[in-house]
Amino acid sequence: MGSSGSMVKPISGFLTALIQYPVPVVESRADIDKQIQQIIKTIHSTKSGYPGLELIVFPEYSTQGLNTKKWTTEEFLCTVPGPETDLFAEACKESKVYGVFSIMEKNPDGGEPYNTAVIIDPQGEMILKYRKLNPWVPVEPWKAGDLGLPVCDGPGGSKLAVCICHDGMFPEVAREAAYKGANVLIRISGYSTQVSEQWMLTNRSNAWQNLMYTLSVNLAGYDGVFYYFGEGQVCNFDGTTLVQGHRNPWEIVTAEVYPELADQARLGWGLENNIYNLGSRGYVATPGGVKENPYTFVKDLAEGKYKVPWEDEIKVKDGSIYGYPVKKTIHS
C-alpha cells in the first residue's frame, strides 16, 4: 500500500483514512466473504500504521463488487443490519475507529434492493444508515433511497453525512446534508474513469457551496471491463483540495480534518456564507432577508410536478439499454 497525506492525529479535529480499495471481481458468495475479511484486515492494518486514526472510509461496491449479472440475486444481497455489518462492527470496536462501509441491501419489504452505506462507531454501534437517493441510472437497478439524508455525530466535533457516488453530482444532496447540520460530507463511489474530472469538481463545489469538508474515495483498478480511478480527495470547507490521491489500488489517502473551522466559517463569515444566505436573500436591504422561495424547480419538486421543458423529447427513461425489463410507470 502507498499513502498520501497526514500521519498524525491533530490536537483538535480528527485523522481520516480513505482506502482506494481494489475493484473486487466477485463471482460467488465465497468471493464476498473474502472481501469482507480483506476489509477487516485493512481496518486493523491501517489503524496499526496510523495509531491516531479515527475515521476509515471504504468505497462503494467494495464489499460485493459490480457483477451486474448477479448483483441483485439472493446470493449477493445482504441485510442491514446483518452478519456482514456485525463483522464490520466488531472490527471497528477492536480498532477503536469509525468506519464507513458499502452494502447492497436486500429490500426488507420484498421489493427492489437498495444501495446502502453505514457508519459504525468505535463502540461497534451502527450510528447511521443511508440508502442511495439517486442511483446511477440507467446502469444501476437499485431502488431510490427512502431514508432521506441522515446526519450523525462523528469524531473531533464532526457532524457526518454520507452520500453515494452519483448522489454527489446533485448539489441538492450536499445542501440537504449541510442544512441538516453536517460539517463533513463523506462520498463513497464506484465510478469508472469517464467521469473522474466531474467527480473531483463536484467534491470541491459541494464543499465550497456549503462550507463543509468533503471526504471522497473511489474504487481503484481494472475489473476486466472498466478502470476505476481511485483518486481519494479531501476538500477544505473553502473548496480547495487538501489532499488528492492517485490512481493506485490500495493507496491510503489520509488527512487532518478540523470541523470546528467549518463551524466558525458558518457563524462568522458574511461574504460567501451561502448556506445561510440562500434563505436570507438581500438582508442588507431587507432586515432578516427575503424568505420566500423564488425557485420554480424547488416548488415543483416539492409538489411532485418536476418536469424539464425538454422532458417529452428525452430518449432514455428506462433501463432497457442495459438489459433491464421495462416496467410500468408508477406515479406517487
Swiss-Prot record:
Catalyzed reaction equations: formamide + H2O = formate + NH4(+)
The family this protein is said to belong to: Belongs to the carbon-nitrogen hydrolase superfamily. Aliphatic amidase family.
Gene: amiF
CDD domains referenced in this protein's UniProt entry, alphabetically: aliphatic_amidase
Name of the protein in question: Formamidase
Domain CN hydrolase: 14-259
Its EC number(s): 3.5.1.49
Record-annotated active site: E60 (proton acceptor), K132 (proton donor), C165 (nucleophile)
Keywords: Hydrolase
GO molecular function terms noted in the UniProt entry: formamidase activity; N-carbamoylputrescine amidase activity
PROSITE patterns in the cross-refs: CN_HYDROLASE
Any single GO BP term: putrescine biosynthetic process from arginine
